[in-house]
Swiss-Prot record:
Domain of life from the UniProt record: Bacteria
HAMAP family: HrcA
Entry keyword set: Repressor, Stress response, Transcription, Transcription regulation
Gene that encodes the chain: hrcA
Functional note: Negative regulator of class I heat shock genes (grpE-dnaK-dnaJ and groELS operons). Prevents heat-shock induction of these operons.
UniProt-listed GO biological process terms: negative regulation of DNA-templated transcription
Protein name: Heat-inducible transcription repressor HrcA
InterPro entries, sorted: GAF-like_dom_sf (IPR029016), HrcA (IPR002571), HrcA_C (IPR021153), WH-like_DNA-bd_sf (IPR036388), WH_DNA-bd_sf (IPR036390), WHTH_HrcA_DNA-bd (IPR005104), WHTH_transcript_rep_HrcA_IDD (IPR023120)
Gene Ontology MF, one: DNA binding
Family: Belongs to the HrcA family.
Source organism of this protein record: Xanthomonas oryzae pv. oryzae (strain KACC10331 / KXO85)
Length: 350
């Protein structure tokens, strides 16, 4: 639900709702009219507050646990809070310094992603998640081919960010070592510094225009590159801190927690959510059922895309209970995205 769909609330009601949700996030206990009368900063009686809370419950922003006279926010209530009531608390200078120092020590993209997810988990006390840039977006530095047997070839691919990938490919024909060396020399001389997708497209285009001996070399290059230069997706997402959720009171249902950990293990659902946010500027928040997945109805996901050299590379975020400190985590996620993007622009990373 977006802010434009929120019910119209007068200033007094907004202040009561803001105070109630902030107190509930802090304490984890249902909030009653007496507590609000003491802490909302309004000159109204508990009886008046009770009437307002009843109205907020009628429109679906609050609910009443059976065992308490107080009220707690619904997912709808959290959405209104996040969209229009929360008062942001940006990370302090020391937190920003920690982020920058940790990410500055990363050696290569995968190391940076791991550091970013660990820092997000440590600073949020929940799960940190970072989607990896697609390898198609990265420039390759060097390639070598080694014949393993009559049908299989080992492709050793070094990217500009110092990552190395070894891939076993099965080309259409057997190649002599001298042929493999010739193709590798050609690819390194012509395409070092180019993105993978550009290389494949360029090879096919040149093959259509080539003749005689050059045509044979290009045909061999296309044959080998068609498999060797296809991006691998084994490291498509990095997560850290999943076990932190085991100590969260709001996620104490073991069956639901087991479902959540199965989602973490498969990664597919989390990646789908991150993909939905990759082109959205700024922070995007999914609260409970907004994820569209039953197994994630008890959690919230706060995400932001990270960019380098003007290009969106991926998304990072925090996964935690719906009762999370949005005022602190929303700006933290945005800051982490900015810092990671800056680190990705450092020489030797891309």
């Amino acid at each position: 639900m977006r802010a434009s769909q929120s019910p119209m609330l007068d200033p007094r009601t907004r202040q009561l709702l803001r105070t109630l949700i902030a107190r509930y996030i802090r304490d984890g206990e249902p909030v009653g009219s007496k507590t609000l009368a003491q802490h909302a900063g309004l000159d109204v009686s508990p009886a008046t507050i009770r009437n307002i809370l009843a109205d907020l419950e009628d429109v679906g922003l609050l609910s009443s646990p059976h065992t308490s006279a107080g009220r707690v926010p619904t997912a709808h209530g959290y959405r209104v809070f996040v969209d229009s009531l929360v008062q942001m608390q940006p990370p302090g200078e020391e937190e920003v310094r920690r982020l920058r120092a940790e990410l500055a020590s990363g050696n290569g993209t995968q190391s940076l992603l791991g550091s970013a997810s660990q820092m997000l988990s440590a600073m949020s006390h929940f799960v940190g998640v970072v989607s990896a840039p697609r390898r198609e977006q990265f420039a390759f530095r060097h390639i070598d081919f080694v014949a393993l047997d009559a049908r299989r070839v080992l492709a050793i691919l070094v990217f500009a960010d110092n990552e190395v990938q070894n891939r076993v490919i099965e080309p259409r024909r057997a190649y002599e070592p001298a042929e493999l060396e010739r193709v590798a020399n050609y690819l390194n001389a012509q395409f070092a510094g180019r993105a993978l997708a550009d290389i494949r497209a360029c090879l096919l285009r040149e093959l259509r225009m080539a003749k005689n001996e050059m045509e044979q070399l290009l045909a061999h290059s296309v044959d080998l590159a068609s498999e060797a230069l296809v991006p691998a997706d084994a490291d498509d997402m990095v997560m850290a801190g999943q076990t932190r959720l085991m100590g969260v009171q709001d996620l104490s249902d073991l069956d639901r927690l087991r479902e959540l950990f199965e989602v973490f293990a498969s990664k597919r659902e989390i990646l789908q959510l991150l993909e939905r946010t990759i082109q959205a500027p700024g922070v995007r928040i999914f609260i409970g059922e907004e994820t569209g997945m039953v197994s994630l109805e008890d959690v919230s996901l706060v995400t932001a895309p990270y960019t380098a050299h003007g290009q969106v590379l991926g998304v990072l975020g925090v996964i935690g209970p719906k009762r999370m400190a949005y005022d602190r985590l929303i700006p933290l996620v945005q800051t982490a995205a900015d810092v990671l993007g800056a680190a990705m622009e450092s020489p030797g990373t891309r």
